[in-house]
């Protein structure tokens, strides 16, 4: 890992770290204010595919988080960027609430498959349609491959198992655009003037948040909220830079030890 420099940026996961659905993690709003009172740049990175960036921003504002749209980098944005780069017409397996982030993208007569978290679309007929497109040579673009995520009623399947099923059935490999891909983290830093060695990532997913960030050259702080399960910190190598109870505790550590 590269030599550490003074901390200049903090990347923060959203779902499971700052909030769980429509409930904020206790103390998270005040902790964010304390972090913003420092000289570090704060950006928010999320794999959520359940809603558009605008809907997500409105949810966060209702929870009284001081966040602006240009501070959020989503895997939906990364997926749209790749679709435009490849100039393909995607079959969009995403939640209907996420469709505004693909406004203007041509989807008739699809020649690619883009898959995120879309429970209402994950049934045999739709998946079989995607399967046939892939057999005909269409590329498979996974917005992310999370195994599961946290809802108020407990853990729930993420898109990863469905992406893997399509990979297995078609003997193909998906291009993943969200966390834990190194390019996702580097893209999130674009325009900040900050390097990975000057950055800390805070999240509740040991692999996608912490492991991905550390593979990109950042430090990773794992919080025990959201989807965290006991001993998650032992599932990645190198281990998280720090494992702590929640986002406010992570901010406490940053203020006391990294600035």
UniProtKB/Swiss-Prot annotation:
- Could you give the cofactor binding note from the entry? Binds 1 Mg(2+) ion per subunit.
Named cofactor requirement(s) = Mg(2+)
UniProt entry keywords in alphabetical sequence: Coiled coil, Magnesium, Metal-binding
Q: Does the keyword Aminoacyl-tRNA synthetase apply?
A: no
Task: State the Pfam families in the record.
Answer: Hydrolase_6, Hydrolase_like
What positions are modified (N6-succinyllysine)?
50
Which Gene Ontology CC terms are recorded? cytoplasm
Q: In this entry, which stretches build a coiled coil?
A: 47-71
Q: Which SUPFAM superfamilies match?
A: HAD-like (SSF56784)
Which residues are substrate-binding?
13-15, 46-47, 179
Q: Which GO terms describe its molecular function?
A: enzyme binding; metal ion binding; phosphatase activity
Under the heading InterPro entries, the entry gives:
HAD-like_sf, HAD-SF_hydro_IIA, HAD_sf, LHPP/HDHD2
Report if keyword Magnesium is assigned: yes
Q: Name the positions where Mg(2+) binds.
A: 13, 15, 204
Give the record's family classification.
Belongs to the HAD-like hydrolase superfamily.
State what protein this is by name: Haloacid dehalogenase-like hydrolase domain-containing protein 2
What is the species of this protein?
Answer: Bos taurus
- Could you tell me the gene encoding this protein? HDHD2
């Amino acid at each position: 890992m590269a030599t550490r420099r003074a901390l200049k940026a903090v990347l923060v996961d959203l779902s499971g770290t700052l909030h769980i659905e429509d409930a904020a993690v206790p103390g998270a709003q005040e902790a964010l204010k304390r972090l913003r009172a420092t000289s570090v740049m704060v950006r928010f990175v999320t794999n959520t595919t359940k809603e558009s960036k605008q809907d997500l921003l409105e949810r966060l504002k209702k929870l009284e988080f001081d966040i602006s749209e240009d501070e959020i980098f989503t895997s939906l944005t990364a997926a749209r960027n790749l679709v435009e780069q490849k100039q393909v017409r995607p079959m969009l397996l995403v939640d209907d609430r996420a469709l505004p982030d693909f406004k203007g993208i041509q989807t008739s007569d699809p020649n690619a498959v883009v898959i995120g978290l879309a429970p209402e679309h994950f049934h045999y007929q739709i998946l079989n349609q995607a399967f046939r497109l892939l057999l005909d040579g269409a590329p498979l673009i996974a917005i992310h491959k999370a195994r599961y995520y946290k809802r108020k009623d407990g853990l729930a399947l993420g898109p990863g198992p469905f992406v893997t099923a399509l990979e297995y059935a078609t003997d193909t490999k998906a291009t993943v655009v969200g966390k834990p891909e190194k390019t996702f983290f580097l893209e999130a830093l674009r325009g900040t003037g900050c390097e990975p060695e000057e950055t800390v990532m805070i999240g509740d997913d040991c692999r996608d948040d912490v492991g991905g960030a550390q593979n990109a050259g950042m430090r990773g702080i794992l919080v025990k909220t959201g989807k965290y399960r006991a001993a998650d910190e032992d599932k990645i190598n190198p281990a998280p830079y720090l494992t702590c109870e929640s986002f406010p505790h992570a901010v406490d550590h940053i203020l006391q030890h990294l600035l």
